[in-house]
From Swiss-Prot:
Keywords: Viral genome ejection through host cell envelope, Viral long flexible tail ejection system, Viral penetration into host cytoplasm, Virion, Virus entry into host cell. It comes from the Viruses. GO terms for biological process: symbiont genome ejection through host cell envelope, long flexible tail mechanism. Its main location: virion. The gene is 16. Functions as a stopper that is part of the head-tail connector and that locks the viral DNA in the capsid. Following tail attachment to the entry receptor, seems to open by a diaphragm-like motion, allowing the genome to exit the capsid through the tail tube to the host cell. During assembly, functions as a docking platform which the preassembled tail tapered by the head-tail joining protein gp17 can bind to. This is Head completion protein gp16. Belongs to the Caudoviricetes gp7/gp16 head completion protein family. It holds the Pfam family Phage_H_T_join. One of its GO terms (cellular component) is virion component.
Length: 109
């Protein structure tokens, strides 16, 4: 499995928390860590994305996990990667999920 998914990513969700004074705050929290293969997009995909004005930077492949939600984001090597569109079950057999993502320019840690 290591050869197929050599990278490690952390999925985060944006959650509401009480601030202790009757108000609410929102913050990103770690949900779970997963093995993955993070691949920069090809020149062809980059060109198509530019034409459609859809900034994509990575294809992320990870074992299927029903906890993955399009409202999440991924931390990869300290970089924040936001989802572009919905995660896709590639085979329809709940084996591998593909996530298209883009860096938002921020770093964690």
């Amino acid at each position: 499995m290591y050869e197929e998914f050599p990278d490690v990513i952390t999925f985060q969700s944006y959650v509401e928390q009480s601030n202790g004074e009757g108000g609410k705050t929102y913050k990103w929290v770690d949900e779970f860590t997963a093995a993955a293969h993070v691949q920069p997009i090809s020149q062809e995909e980059y060109y198509k994305a530019q034409q459609l004005q859809t900034p994509i930077g990575y294809n992320i492949y990870t074992p299927y996990d029903d906890r993955i939600d399009k409202k999440m984001r991924v931390i990869y090597r300290g970089k924040i990667v936001t989802f572009i569109g919905d995660p896709v079950d590639l085979s329809g057999l709940q084996e591998i999920t593909r996530i298209k993502g883009k860096e938002d320019g921020a770093y964690v840690g």
